[in-house]
Amino acid sequence: MTEIFRSEKDGFPLVGLRSEVVEISIVPALGARVFSLFNRRTRREWMWSASEKRKLFPNAFGDAFEQGTLTGADECIPTILPCRWKGRDLPDHGEVWSRSWQLDEKDLAAEKLTTSVTLPLTPFLLTRTISLNNADLRFDYQLESKAPESEPFLWSWHPLLCFEDGDYFELPSPTEDLKVEIALNPTGARGETWPVERLRQMAGSQDGFLKAFVPAGNGKAALVHGKTKERLELSWNPDQLPWLGIWITRGGWNGYHHAALEPTHGAPDALDVAVEQWRAHATLACGETTHWHMNIHLTE
């Protein structure tokens, strides 16, 4: 049985779904971010926050992402890093994380969290539907183009996940190498290839960070809590989302300790580089609509 609930945090309405195992809540007014992903049986909160009180506040369109609440999981589209594309100054972490999304009350009555947003610069309409079945979540996405011509884009799920000493990733099979976006301690530059062992070393660091990409492989990845072996498992269709972004900071970025697994259409994080150099991106034709999905499973 799935229960619908509403609450409020710092003046912002939250809406969520609850099963015997999982509780998830979102903030429609703040990018429809996933505020909390909570295992009710183990009492583990998977979503990290920069603020001990998980404080929420609004941001202006175009703000740097690190000026935001840094809480939970955001949607990033059509870029992650800021860049200029087709005469548009695309903002840091995309166009929708700082925007208010529309909640579909009819779908909510049917135990679905459906929210939608029109991008301010790129002529797209993005709709996301979250459904819950016991310990399993499904995120369904629909992207509709209102553009007069084809538009390349990147979409990435952008969760900030709690990460502690002893925690570790399980990456898609097969994964042998990482394609670096940026790294510190050790330093790495965009396009470098690192052995996957470097990720394990970074997880044990106290002063580094790493953003890298791997091919989606079998479309499965997980974050494992080292002490309890609890797992957050992601699965997706690698034909739809052929890359996985990996982010980890062990004190190297603003002193924070968190991690992310980011299924995505392409790489690296800047749309212009993804199109012109790496040639790893998606494209939506004039008037076209596309769909993709992602699954999350929480284990004890």
Where do the protein language model's features map onto the residues?
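Surface-exposed acidic/polar loop and edge beta-strand patches at domain peripheries
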Residues: M1-R138, K146-L154, H158-E300
